[in-house]
Design a protein with these regions (language model features):
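Surface-exposed, interaction-prone regions used to assemble/regulate multi-protein complexes
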Residues: 1-115
Length: 115
């Protein structure tokens, strides 16, 4: 499967499968996966549907297959008081229907403090 679309909230593959993030916002923090920062080479790769996921605590996560892993940086923009936790999901598409995403990772994102 190949990447067909990258937005601020997800990565979509040509078979309809998606990778996306979630964070239960408390108040004044913004935790997110910066999907738009993936390497341009990732658009050319043909991934197996059985993706592997690895967290890189305080920096982001990697996904892909043996020998072809793509890094996605993750950030938490806040004042340092709130959680930096972010969850990553992988949702398969079956017969054109996007199924509920399976939770694949949970970790602390890189804090980008503001005053």
């Amino acid at each position: 499967m190949k990447i067909t679309q990258v937005t601020e909230v997800d990565i979509t593959f040509d078979n309809g499968n998606r990778i996306y993030f979630d964070h239960d916002q408390d108040c004044c923090e913004h935790n997110y996966a910066d999907f738009k920062q993936i390497d341009d080479l990732a658009w050319e790769w043909d991934f197996d549907e059985n993706l592997k996921f690895e967290s890189c605590p305080h920096s982001g996560f990697r996904f892909g297959n043996e020998g072809r892993m793509v890094f996605v940086p993750c950030y938490s923009s806040q004042n340092g008081y709130y959680s930096t936790w972010i969850d990553i999901y992988y949702a398969p598409c079956w017969c054109g229907v996007l199924l509920d995403g399976g939770h694949v990772l949970g970790f602390n994102a890189k804090m980008d403090e503001y005053e």
